[in-house]
Amino acid sequence: MKKLLILLLIIAVLASICGCAEEEPEIQVPVNFYYRRTQVTFEDSNGVIAPEVREAQGHENDLSYLLDLYLSGPNGEDMERTFPYGTKLVSISVSEERTTVTVTSHFANLNNVNLTIACACITKTVMELTNTSSVEIKAHGTMLNGADSVIMDNENVLLLDDSAMDPAMN
């Protein structure tokens, strides 16, 4: 009888331990933050970037807060930090068609494909947050690859390589 009681006690303890796993809170107000993937793929419309779904935490209308959160980097292991450490938001202005984002000069340390990917990530993120059709990106007090700014929209954010796909499948 004692052995049965001890066995039941052990089962109860194990069951309670298994039930104590911390559940991730349900996302109430999701926002998509786009980052570079750790494993590059060209099999979908995002290519080398992908969205990480995050909680707006009651700040869904506070673009400065959301972009500061975004620039702090991804939470998931399947995404890479897209921006140099120290990159912060300086200003953001939204017009009917375009959002202008100015970040600290750390961003100007990017060039070539890394700058293109980072700008694509910011563009996709900001266009979803603001519902504007293009994004102008500036680095405070410096140039980006020899230009004052980079302007992107959905047409020049295409990172999909569909050259190996059968045209009949499209």
Which residues make up each language-model segment?
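Bimodal "functional hotspot" detector
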Residues: 4-9, 15, 19-170
